[in-house]
């Protein structure tokens, strides 16, 4: 009887431990017009029923604020509740609007209560604010950023806002580029977070070999470097993708064949194993941007522009191993050398044209430095160096002024597979290879319990 109960428990725990998979959703369309609740509902329904997939049932938001308003809660919330879509909430942390963001968060909690709480998988305080605040971000005119100390303060404010509410158990993190994460002067943000969000686009790494055949290696390397400084905290993949159309970036060609290859090589190993929010379901309504990353075209449809099935794709190497993360740490300036600016960014790199569309900007048109938003390919997140480069730290800690030079990245390896049984997580962390939100930890824990009978 004990065995049956434990197996039942395994299934129950596995169900709760399944990694979230979804897309990023801005509060406006590509022409800057605000999305309505029905717009969000249609997108969420489409994502759940995409042909060739098991369904993308999670949504990452950039802001808590409805487009065109100052502090009204975003209408994606009631749409998500109606469509049973989980939410990675976003607090826009640049430009001095945090008070309104938190006000909208509190209003949403009061309005939607327990239904809201059970759909929230996490809260991201900020999106690439550290990159935008770096020397390279300022050079690229990526928009307003935020200092590490400010982000830490905002994280604490959000914790206070959700204490004792239906969202009290929501893990809080921050989303940024890997070069921001490995910059030692930003380590206080890592300390304040429950998880780290990773944004990366090999397509834009145009100062190095970045053909589609290079893409997975570039992606894995940058994730490993992020894991190496994460201090054992989970690294969630909050943005990545490959464009279906648009200009060529060095060796990176935007077309559906390459978008499919990137989906197979990078996406499929992640889906179901690591919390992942892909960029993007649709970005061509009503205007098609250059480049365009949408997996559906200008008309919302459950039939994608390319085959999304992963059945024939290996699920191995969902995230880089702990060994790879440790190696990345040693090659990313872990010795503690200090430099001014990102030493891993290619000197004199050429900049690409900035996209003109607005999907994914902050509330009411403020820039999001990650693609989408104000983009320049000289950004360190696009042009970081390969393994073995020295001195990954030292971006400015203030908006392009006299900011401090940070120390090199510390060589922490990350063990991110979580489960309801901490002892099994520790025992099996090497085998799990750091799979964030994986079924592995839950099932393995039950087998450990069975072995002890």
UniProtKB/Swiss-Prot annotation:
Cellular localisation: Cell membrane; Secreted, Cell wall
Q: Tell me, what does this protein do in biology?
A: Glucanases play a role in cell expansion during growth, in cell-cell fusion during mating, and in spore release during sporulation. This enzyme may be involved in beta-glucan degradation and also function biosynthetically as a transglycosylase.
Q: What Pfam families does UniProt report for this protein, alphabetically?
A: Glyco_hydro_17 (PF00332)
Q: Which family does it belong to?
A: Belongs to the glycosyl hydrolase 17 family.
Q: Spell out the Polar residues composition-biased ranges.
A: 370-380
Q: Which residues are glycosylated?
A: 183, 364, 368, 376
Q: Where is this region: Disordered?
A: 370-423
Recorded GO CC terms: cell surface; extracellular region; fungal-type cell wall; plasma membrane; side of membrane
Q: How is it modified after translation?
A: The GPI-anchor is attached to the protein in the endoplasmic reticulum and serves to target the protein to the cell surface. There, the glucosamine-inositol phospholipid moiety is cleaved off and the GPI-modified mannoprotein is covalently attached via its lipidless GPI glycan remnant to the 1,6-beta-glucan of the outer cell wall layer.
Please state what the protein is called. Answer: Probable glucan endo-1,3-beta-glucosidase eglC
Keyword hit for rRNA processing: no
